[in-house]
Each structure stands twice: as structure tokens, then as C-alpha cells.
Amino acid sequence: MQWNEDVCIVSGDNRAWQDGGEPKTVIELWCRSRDGHSTLLLVNGLKPYIEISDPSTDEDSSESKLSLEKVSATKDVRGDPVSNGMKLSTRDGKVRPHYRVFVRDTTKVRGVRKALSGIGWTVTSADILFVQRLLLDLDLGPHVRMSGEILWAGDRAPEEAKTPETTDREMAQSRIIEVGGSGLYPLDMVVSCDISGLERADPFPAPFVTLSFDLETSIADNTILCAAAIVDRAGKRTEYPIKGAETDILEKLTEVVRSEDPDFITGYNIDNFDLPRMEERSEGISPNSESDRAPLLGWGRVPMSESEIKKGWRRPGRIFPSREQNRTWTIKGRIPLDAWWQARQTLRPQRESLKYVSKLLWPDDEEMHKMNIDASKMDEEWAARPDEVLEYCVRDAVLPLDILDNLKSIARKEALASVSLTTVDIAATSTTSRWIDSLVIRLADREGVAVPNTNQGPRKQGKIAGGYVHEVDPGVEPWVVVLDFKSMYPSIMISNNICSTTLVRDDSEDKSHSVSPTTSTRYISKEERLGLVPQLLEGLMDSRDIHKSALAKANEEGDKDEAFLQDQLQYAVKILMNSFYGVFASNFYRFTHPSLGASITEWARYNIKSIISKVEDEGHKVVYSDTDSIFVRAPVDKGSPKNRPSGAGDLEKWDKAKNMSMEFGESLAERFTKEGAELEFETALSSFFSHGAKKRYVGRVVWPREEMLIRGYEVRRTDSFQILSDIMTQMFEMILDGNTIGAVDMTKSVIDRIREGDVEPAQLVISRSCKGRWDSKKNEWDFDSVYANPDGLPYVRAAKQRIAAGLQFTPGMKVGYIVTKPDEGDKKLGIRAWLVDEIGGEPPDYDKEYYAGRLAKSLGRVTDAFGWDEKNLLKGTRQDSLDKWF
């Protein structure tokens, strides 16, 4: 039975198989359909291949000196090389003939590549995953329209897809194997199609299914006491509280995963606790039999068959979750998306416990806060009140779903996949270079550019000079306009045609070349050859404008769903564009060169310095500049109020100053904009302050919205503590108002309160990231191999204390602690881990002098600009009158 529908590709893989003795490779695409059911596509018709060229050839001498017959005779090569035309090599900038070489299957590519390199050929396009190859060659993204034959239709499949043939399990399994599949996959539908049955579809919000789970485990012996899973299917949630014998718990949880068939699997800290613990316990229960372990942890979206259970080369069977070198997990066909990591990356919270993050997101909603169970005494809690512990476990499984919803994490991953034209799992869990690869390689294939292998270029390079930062004088400046370069690095790359495909590698010179201002690196003109990167960036900039226009239209028409989709897409384009410089300035990317990043920052420094010079020549004061922003004093009437006044007369003066600043900012942006350096009037400030250090300033924004702008100070550092952030913010408000005496008096009063012990300890918690390595031989956390003096580091000592209390530790997590008075005779700081959020109890007593000193040191850097340094704040006496500063 034929079937057509739109689907979103969640993940992909491939399998080698034999079709009547002929080797073939089938691509498995795990998808979620527009209508909500899951579909596995088995795609045949694409053959694995690499490309080769003879490095001795070029445009003028295209006859190869190397033997093509030897290529054909190479082990695991299928057939003769096929001419693939003339292609540009980014290795040396020469155009030469290239040939396509077909390989028996994807597992043989590495060997063929090594063999052909060994006899002199330059091998390209040889490290591209086969699923990615499919998307590249067919110019597909994650959203596709497919046409194929239904092999299986389960209970949740559309009724019109169900026939006696498609619902017969034995018949379906046989038909799936006949086209290269592994067996009956645990999805709603399995469809077979040829590559001709796939085409790109317009983006749509796929109705993904997400499963969140949590475990409660014994402190004494690590056994699993209970578990909970919550499945979110199109907004409808189903709860699965699970208890019983440990084996039963694991089997039931696996049964839920395989029957509910989620695309995303989440939880809080599942990467570092729940998944490793399940792996550990399943191996403990069935140490010698992978087949016995499969019902305990067979979460992969593949058949529970012998071929999928048995170990591969250096990897477990595909049915089992697998931990990668970067500590992330893969579950074949599904996407593990840890809510802890998403919250950490998006919110950058001072503390990272689930309870703290929940209160951060929903401060006034007690229902959203974690229940009070002492996790450090879980064995006692389980023995005394198992029902409450199970309820606690269920709540811990619900909250990650709420966190992902609040952060729009899944929608943003899908939008990024749509923009970068990758499968959703690549957008969700992979690196920026993989996203950019997807765009650059398909354009390179179209433009006749050979695709080098990763790591082929130089591995080491000197540090690239950063952007220009203008010196800033200490003090307050009234009425300042901020000009930003629009998409500065992308604009420079576009206007100067910067790309590895346009870099002039010899000593030739031409008037048409773009020449970098410092090192005189040359790039050929757009007329001679438009670089891959400028082409892509221009396309992305245009597409972002289209999405933003569509967003505005949807908002006008009240179409919330369309507005949400377009907003996610334009944001994804922004993320992708901002990633280009970092990738192309790196020393690992396949299309990079050491000159590229240096050229970009050269032009950036040149552009901003030239504009500063012109502005100052006109008599305007440049207060500050930083990489892509310029702060200029606006010519407003002297004595204009810096804060919005309440009186009508002063309000008129304030409005006049605001309007004059806005007109001035617009005129500067218009006059100094040029190709590759488009200026935008970004912000108007009624007051600007810095204590004289680069990258540290504050301002009161009056346009386009009214808010406080703070950059570089402890307020924005996650290793600060709450009262310091709060007081610094209040102090800046006073300083911007001109009330410096009041700011200093307030600072002194808070220092006095700390010395008197009149501050809540929760406001003094310091959080720092802490690394560690699990020593499986000793069955304990090892910090000595990570830090030279771990016991001298307060956050390591705090981490050890939370481990000793039976609480989770995750390498890289933020560990909260309070500084206490040192023990008698001990020269080190006293440290007590902050565990109140997780297990309750009385907070530790803090070291009053330490915190008074820390506050004085941080705030003194600011008030020193008016004659009040750290020592004077602690003493309560000032050096000089403040009036001279204003």
C-alpha cells in the first residue's frame, strides 16, 4: 500500500545488507509525522562514496599520473571511478579533475580512504555521515514529504494505513527485512521508499512526543527504589509511577519507553545520574548476558533482536543507550535532552538544583516547587513513607517537562534543524560545525568545490587578535547614544568575500582584490568567484528578514501558532549566523584557514577605529567602544535631567533631551554606514557610568525601552552571591541618578549589617563550577587528577561534603557553599556546602568579616572612582569630597 505524508526527521542511521548477493546500504530515518504518529523510513538507492583527485594535476595539466585501474582494484571499491568534473581544492586553491569512488558499505570507507591516500590520491568527501550525505545530495532538511510503501501499521497509525497485510506482525517483519531493515521496529508505522520518494517540505511544528523520567535510589547500595515516567503527547500527559523489585522497575520503565515511543527523553540531570545509574544497575543484574539486559535498558528505537543487542566495535548494541566521549548520551532513534543542561545553558542560574531552578522559573507557584523529601536520607525516607517518596519521584519527572516547555527548548531545536537543514538530533546535541557543515558542503557540491576532510588543515595557530576596545574614563556621562554594527562579522565576510575558496594563496596582486588592512591578506573579487561563506551568509540574512516580516504579519493577524514558528525560525537563523565566525576562525574546521579569522578581526578593528576618528573630528566625545559598539555623548542641553522626572517642567526637558539623543543617534548611523559596516542606532542612555575598566559599564536605557543596562560587573556573574548582586544594582541606580553619597552610605550600611549577622545566609551562597572524575576502580569521585590542590579549593571541598551527605554530584555542576569561620588553627577558609535547598535543615553560620571584606572589595572597585576604596568602605571614612566628580 502506497503512502504519502509530511514528516520531521528526528534522527537517522544506516545498515549494510545483501540484496541477492549485491551489497546495499539502507538508511533508517526515525520521524514524527505532521499528524502525530511515528514513522520509520527505510530509504534505499544511495550508494556510499568518496571523491579523489591527483594532486599533480590542475586546469592546464588534467591528465592524471596516478592509475585509476589501481583504484578500481582496491579492496572494497565497487566498480570504476566516475568522473565528477573539475573542482576547486581549498587545500591549495587549484582546480583539478575529481573522481567519485563507490565503496562497498560505510564501514569500509576508512580503509578505502587510507589505501587510496597511501598510493598518492587526495581523498575528499570521506568523513561525511551517510544520513547527512542523503540530506546533502537530495538537498533535504528535517521536514520532508515522503512517498513509499507501508510495511507496518501499528495501533496509533492512521486507520487508512491499516490493512490485513500491514497489521500482520510476522508479515511486516519479513517485508521489512526484505528491504534491509532489522526487523519490526517499535514505531507506529514503517515505510519503505527510494531516494526518489523524498522531497523537501515547508517547515511545520512537529507534534513530538516527550518522555521525562526520574529514579530514586538507595544511598547504601545504589539500588533503584522506585521510578516515574511522564509522557507528553500533544499536550496530554500520562503518568507512570513505578515500584516493586529493581528488575521489575527497569523492565516496566523500558516497556513504557518502547510502547509510548517518545522522540525526546528528558529528566533532570539524566546524563550524569539516571542514565549512568540504570546502566550500572542493569549490568549488575545481568553482568554476562546482553540478551537478559535488553528488557532492562532496551531504549533504542530498534527491534529487540539478537543483531541489535550484540555489541559492535567498541560500542554496545544499538538497543542500549550509549555514552559518547563528550559525556552526552545517544539513544538510537531518540534524542536525550537533559533539562538540567538546558536550564544551565539558558538561565545560567547561580545554583542548579531542581528546587532552585523551579523557584527561579515559578517563584510564586508552590505547585511548581519540588516536594520536601530529604534525598540524603533516601533509604530512611523510603522505609518510613514510600508513597510520599514515589509522589516526590513523579513530581521530579513532571518538572523537567515544564522546564523544557518554559524555555521552548524543543521548538528551538526543531527551528535550528530547519534552518541548518539537519536532522533534529544534530541540532539538539551536536556542535556548531556540524550545523554549518550541512549548509557549506551542499553549496560546495553545487559550486564545484572539493570537500576536504576535517582536521586536514593546520592544527596549531597563534591567537587571533580580538576586537578593538576604546579606553573609558571613570565617572558618569549624561545622555549617550549607542551605535552597533549590524551583524558585524557576517557583514565583513560578505563585503570582502572572505572564504577559503577565495583566499589568494600565491603572491599575485590585482586591483580587484579585497586586501585586509593589517596583514594585507588578499581575497579575489566577487566578480571572479563568489565565496561559499558570503553566499551562505547573504542567504541567511535575507531569510531572517523574511521570517521577521512573516512574524510581524502573523502578529498583526493574530495567528499565534504562525507567529511562534516564525519567531523560532528567525532566532535560529540568528544563532547560526553568529556561529560562522567562531567556526571559520577555528583551527579544526574543514573549510578553515588561519588567515580567515585574522582578516575578519582586522577589518572589524579598522572599521570601528576609523568611525571613532571621524566622530571625534566632528567634535563629539566617544565615551567608549567595544568590538562592535560605539558610545557617543549626545549634544543635549546642559543640565538636562538624567532620570525621568515627575514634574511637568522637568519632564519636558527630559523628553527634549531624549528626542535630541534619538535624532543624533539616527543621524550618526546614517552618515557613517558603508558596505560591510552598516551602523544601527541601537540604544539611547540618559546616563552612563564606568569606574574606568574595559568591558565594565552601566547605563539607564530610555530607548527603545526603559531598563538598566549592566555589563561586566558582579551582578552578571553566576559565581557572585545574591546580596552583592542586589546591592550593586541599587548602587548603580543611585550613581546614575547622581546620588553618589547615598550610594556609598547604603553600601556602608549593608557592610555593617553583614558584620552584625543581620543578613539571611541564603543571600550569601557562592556557587562555582566543579569538575571531577569517577574512579570506577575505587568506586569514588576523584578530584586529584583534575586539580593540583583540590583541598585548597572551596568548591571542591563543598562538592566532597555534598557527596558525603549522599547527594548527587555531576562533573561541571555548580556547587553552592557558605564561607564560615575556619576551624581553630586552620589557615584555610571555612567551607560548608549549601544543602538547604535539597535537604532542608538549619543554614550554616557565615564568616562575617569575610563577607564584609568581599562586599567592600567588589563595591570598592566602583566607588573608588569617587574616592572611596575598599579600605575606606570598611573603615567608614572617605578620602575626599564626592562633589568634584559631578
PLM features: residue spans?
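Conserved RNase H-like, two-metal-ion catalytic cores of nucleic-acid enzymes
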Residues: 1-79, 184-269, 280, 285, ...
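N-terminal accessory regions of nucleic-acid-interacting proteins
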Residues: 92-203
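Common nucleic-acid-contacting/processivity interface regions adjacent to the catalytic cores
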Residues: 142, 146-160, 168-171, 376-496, ...
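Active-site cores of enzymes that catalyze phosphoryl transfer or operate on phosphate-rich substrates
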Residues: 196-234, 520, 528-589
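Active-site-proximal helix-loop-helix substrate-binding element of RNase H-like nuclease domains
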Residues: 261, 265, 275, 284, ...
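Active-site palm subdomain of RNA-directed nucleic acid polymerases
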Residues: 366, 607-627, 632
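Catalytic palm subdomain of template-directed nucleic-acid polymerases
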Residues: 630-662
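C-terminal, non-catalytic extensions of nucleic-acid polymerases
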Residues: 662-886
